[in-house]
Amino acid sequence: MHTPVPRLHRFPGRPALLAALLPLALACSQTRDTSHDACPPEAPALATGGAPHALKTVFVIVMENQDWSDVAGSPSAPYVNGTLLPAFAHALDYRTGGLHPSLGNYVWLEAGDPLGIHFDAPPADVPLPVTCHLATYLEDVGLTWKAYAEGISGDTCPLVNEGKYAVRHDPFVYFEDVSGRPFDPHSARCIAHVRPFEELASDLAAGTVPRYAFIVPDVCDDGHDACPPLNDPVGQQDAFLAREVPAIMDSAAYRDGGVILIVWDEGHRGDHPIGLIAVSPLAKPGYAAPGAYTHGSTVRTVQEILGVTPLLRTAATSASLSDLFTAYP
């Protein structure tokens, strides 16, 4: 005789059980792997010896969520294709290993590794006790840095989304040595270094721009969202770059060994190549670098230009972007 198999929906407690398990499942999906948190045994130091560096000041601008094939040759990006690519160098094979979504990629650009983050969350949900990351390395050896973020007031440490400011695109505030333990919106270190984007122009004009400047556009200018009047993420990115890159290029900091690294955080289809453009008086004009690169390459390049050791995590095993320049570092 056939005995019917009971169906789950016949159990009256099933909805309550699912409701109880859902928070646990979400918590597990947002648990980061801490196995890469360890710091190198060496203390941060400035490299000594050798010739003076040709490259001296680094600006990083991060764009959002486009494969390179969506940007290269696109009629929505006339500034990138008609001005930047003919005059400067770019990478053909820059990838993130298929890492999604945003936060892990931004942390990678600061710490040399995603630090086990494969989800988006505010700092309160993913505090990073790690002390070996670029900002702290630079301060430890006496070099200056700032993040310039659109849409923040500068009166507090911007630990939550606000208007068009996305906190997940601002990696510095996730580190407890920057934002406090527990996180503190009044953290003096954070407020001193994470500044409104508008201050970049005055710092450039006054000659007080830091040696390392990380630029955080809002979710319209970085192309994360489709925003009016263009309603075209690639077009929005291009318009922002066309407006802001020339302003940086007009500064003494750029003319005297400056480099602007324009990088996309991730693609939107698996692990296809994403964009990396090196804008500098010392970039190879019109050059398309064939090498394989990652966010670890960007971190390595920043460290080598600024002369800061030891190399952070994947920066130690990634190729630098030296091939994109006529003189390096």
What are these model-derived regions, one by one?
Residues 25-27:
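C-terminal motif of bacterial Sec signal peptides marking the signal peptidase cleavage site
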Residues 10-13, 17, 35:
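Sequence-pattern detector for short linear motifs
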Residues 30, 36-329:
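N-terminal pro-sequences and low-complexity stem/linker regions of secreted or lumenal proteins
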